[in-house]
């Protein structure tokens, strides 16, 4: 006959993968810890000893793990061996128990005596040494029941039970599920128990009595006889007093407490296994409550605890429920929805589910708090897909992963560095709430960012300085949100200039400043100048050699530009600091106070420093509103296609250099040239050449040039061609140019050209041409000059009194005045008045002398003499003639002809 199989042991088994992972995590953690502490160990021998101890322990653990993996290949044999050992221990316990039972039986048989009146049995014992039959003294003989009687009785009992249960009003809802068979009613409560009850008589209101009881959970073994007897007595008493409701309450409490005992047994076994040192538990039997505290290594005396209370919490609702307190705060059922104590009583699964929820809660709270702290820079923190880890960017190249060990509750930060390990210790030693964890991680971000910038800057030639600013200075310049300040400088800079890096409270991006400081008497520093440097950066920016080199270039230029910026502020000239593509500062000036209308209101000033020195020149760039084609030179450059002009100012770093004065001088010079060019274009004249020194244009057939004031020639000068008839009034034109500008000069040249051309012609005709007279005189001797003195006197002299008033002197005859009058801006408003000016009367003749003839007066003024040529529109005024500019020459020629008659 084949025996039954050996029972299989399933308790205290751990997955091989989980065990291997735990060994690897512990080895990594110990190795990281010893590597972190090695720099603080002074002796090399001690360092080697500490490292060797860690390696030996790790090797022992990995050897054990290797043995386990070898066993895993023959897992069936090993499992069978474990089952055999467990079965042998069980058999030994059985024999031990049998021995104890036999001893107890021998002790109890002393009271097992036959009654004295049973003489028959006594005689048998006396004669034969033992009774030959069971005694039936005073006993009525039993009648055997027929099977038909038994079946009929059972059917009757079934009918009576059906009727009685149908009429019963005190059946609890949990007993609505029942079946009737074999003369008994069986009530089943799912995942709890089954109970059989029967009736003692055939009355419809007779009481029920307890028959049998079975548990529907655990190993479903028979209850011990003592427990069963106690339960039967209590059940019959409850049925007799209060019916089925009392029976349900009694049996349900018993089943639930029995289940709690089995649950507590699991907890005790778990405390000896993988969860050792992480659980604290207690069973309150009088309250039907198990208090299970997890992550006890994280719970100091002053910190709130995380507990699971498993038990019966209501007499009206008899069931096992779970109440979860997470770090001292009860978690509502709607959040966790834990179903435990019914179908599932696996405490390991319950703990795994709860710790997973707790882990997700911590991760979610830390994530929310970090996003609130980071503000717009929330891309630095992200959740992993499973929600069990949080990735946090510390710098552009470094990040860490925040999570919690579900077994111990300790915080773990991956990608370890010295700062990250320090933060991990702080999280495990000091932190009790997720908001504190977020603050520690946020501080780690700030420290990592500051340390990254400091390390890279020092590696690229910068020096970090310990500068102490007062609290008021910090608040004034950096605000209340600045957490860390780093002072950097270059060795070649002046000692009081620094680049300041501030890390704001939100930890998003560092702010860069250029600062000029001075030391106060109390050794604290104060800022004379603190300007923001706008760096094109984002979360992916690298604070590498390229960026820091660009910062050196920008800051060096900015330091040299500082006196110029102070001058602009003092002159109340609006400006903005920009940054060029070559990473140098660019000053954008509002030049509305420097120029009027010819240029746009913005000027860009680009500094250029010589390599290896502090010498600097300034390139000023602007744009004219109208495109000009002006020639360029060493100090100014014009782009005829775009209208952009560029100025170069030398010696910007020399003492006494004034940017405002230099700009005013250069821009006014350009403005004057531009105004002249626009004037010439407006007047419809032809521009011949234009430069920064001179502008030349055509006026009729003649060319007129104007010298522009400059540093070498501070005066504006008008130049006429040698044959220009206006040379006679050049001094008056120059005076008008100095006082009123070029427009009235051009107007005079245009308006009076007919007049002075005619005057030049008349002068040549009457022998008043200076060149012709000079030629004649040069060919005569002194005696001829005396003889021809009267003959050589000019018959016409032109005497200009101003640019608009000229007198024609006819010696011995008369004077003619020509006056230009402008009544309005229209062409009709310009008139020439030609009139006869009275001569001075000769003195009265001396006695004996003939009387002097009185000069005659022309008769042309009153219109009595008709012109023999077309003089155009002329108005006779009795004492003169008014005519237009186009006809003034013809009128003068006609008047001259009348004078010559």
UniProtKB/Swiss-Prot annotation:
An individual GO BP term: regulation of transcription by RNA polymerase II
List UniProt keywords, sorted A-Z: Activator, Nucleus, Transcription, Transcription regulation
Q: Which GO terms describe its molecular function?
A: transcription coregulator activity
What InterPro entries would the database entry show?
A: Med14_N (IPR055122), Mediator_Med14 (IPR013947)
- State one Pfam family annotation: Med14
Q: What's the subunit arrangement here?
A: Component of the Mediator complex.
Stated name of the protein: Mediator of RNA polymerase II transcription subunit 14
Q: Top-down, what is the taxonomic lineage of the species of origin?
A: Eukaryota, Fungi, Dikarya, Ascomycota, Saccharomycotina
Gene name in the database record: RGR1
